[in-house]
Amino acid sequence: MLPVAVVLVVFAVAVTSAESIHQVNPLPRRRRLKGTEEKGHHTNVNDEERVISLESASDLISKLKVKINAKLLAGDSAKPATLSKAQVASVAKEVVKEVKKTPKVWPPPMIKKGVRRGAGGVR
């Protein structure tokens, strides 16, 4: 019981010796944040300039349409119940090629996450 009393006395002396907490540890004044700083360090999406090469994206879409049409002509259904591993691998390889050609065109979090799982990954 004696050590607890000693600790309480020391704490009481320390608190009463300082007139206020702000003298012991002054807090910095906060400045008002600008509109862009409140949202984070990123700029507004509408203010961003993106260079999108529509040729590579349209080429990929046209290649996929050709594959679908070839499957339809061969007698396969347009929407198979499940995709085979070979189908997933072939589409993933094409996507990897396109993403490696123009990585800034594709949205990084979504496409790279799927590509890493599908065909060896993209850095």
UniProtKB/Swiss-Prot annotation:
List the effects observed when the gene is inactivated: Leads to reduced virulence on etiolated soybean seedlings.
Q: Which domain of life is it from?
A: Eukaryota
Q: Which residues cross the membrane?
A: none
Q: Does the keyword Zinc-finger apply?
A: no
One GO cellular component this record assigns the protein to is: extracellular region
Q: Which UniProt keywords apply?
A: Host endoplasmic reticulum, Secreted, Signal, Virulence
The segments labelled Disordered in the record are: 24-46
Where can the motif RxLR-dEER be found?
30-50
**Is Signal one of the keywords?**
yes
Q: Where in the cell is it found?
A: Secreted; Host endoplasmic reticulum
Region annotated BiP-binding, chain positions: 60-82
According to its record, what is known about the domains? Residues 60 to 82 are required for the interaction with host plant binding immunoglobulin proteins (BiPs) and subsequent virulence.
* Free-text function comment from the UniProt entry: Effector that suppresses plant defense responses during the early stages of pathogen infection. Suppresses cell death induced by effectors and PAMPs in plant hosts. Avh262 stabilizes endoplasmic reticulum (ER)-luminal binding immunoglobulin proteins (BiPs), which act as negative regulators of plant resistance to Phytophthora. By stabilizing BiPs, Avh262 suppresses ER stress-triggered cell death and facilitates Phytophthora infection.
According to the record's subunit comment, the protein's assembly and interactions are: Interacts with host plant ER-luminal binding immunoglobulin proteins (BiPs) such as soybean BiP1, BiP2, BiP3 and BiP4.
**So what family is this one in?**
Belongs to the RxLR effector family.
Q: What's the protein here called? A: RxLR effector protein Avh262
**Organism, as annotated:** Phytophthora sojae (strain P6497) (Soybean stem and root rot agent)
